[in-house]
Amino acid sequence: MTTLKFIVPLIVLTACTDRQSGVINAKQSTGKDTVFKHDTIFYTNNNWQDGFGLTHDPEVDSIWSKPVKFYIDNPRCSPIAIDFYQGQFRPTDNNTTAALLSLATTNDNQLRPFYRWCLNKTIQIQDGALAEYTGVPARQYAEKFPKEFFEYMDYDTTGDKYKDWIAAISYSGFYDKDDYKNPLEIRKHLTQTMKQNCINCNEQLKKRIDKFAADCFP
């Protein structure tokens, strides 16, 4: 009986502690200010998408000259990406975030612009631990689709997007095999991969690839 009296207050205390956390286990709560998605629950009482320019009307919002409805109505579209657009999933340092960002290198030409947008917006809001997750997928996208990458960068005439991506790759865009103390070797691998994937690559684009590699790993 004494043991039970001790356990009950402990359970109550644990529940209160969990309720104060921004991310809790999906099996523990049904609070009205939370959204159940995947393996986590995120509180949604703060608008973390400020500055995204969204109305959350998929027929009004557009990404890469197409309404968002074009992407989210596609039966192949990832639910994680849809949740991200709707503001129901905020990236943080977990496996769901890693899965979302890895979608940017998909071979699906119809959905890739949407996934790339998710990666770009995550780069915009990254801080702390989240910054550890953006560099590799950003580098992989640039390596796999070099022409598309530069076209995407050029769409922003301010140059801020390019700087953001450079910062992300410079910070966390190292592969396991990379020697961070040898940036010359990393640049060599990066330029070789991009040029191999750059079909009918002219000299101007090759020079841009060289500069990009130098910017990422000076």
Map each language-model feature to its residues.
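Boundary/linker elements of alpha-helical solenoid repeat scaffolds
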Residues: 47-48, 92-104
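Bacterial Sec signal peptide processing site at the extreme N-terminus
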Residues: 18-28
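C-terminal motif of bacterial Sec signal peptides marking the signal peptidase cleavage site
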Residues: 14-15
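Extended alpha-helical scaffolding segments
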Residues: 125-218
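Sec-dependent signal peptide recognition
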Residues: 1-9
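Short secondary-structure capping micro-motifs at structural edges
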Residues: 86-87, 98-106, 115-128, 133-139, ...
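Coil residues (strongly favoring Ser/Thr
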Residues: 33-34, 39-40, 62, 157
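Amphipathic alpha-helical scaffolding segments comprising HEAT/armadillo-like alpha-solenoid repeats
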Residues: 61, 65, 77-83, 111-120, ...
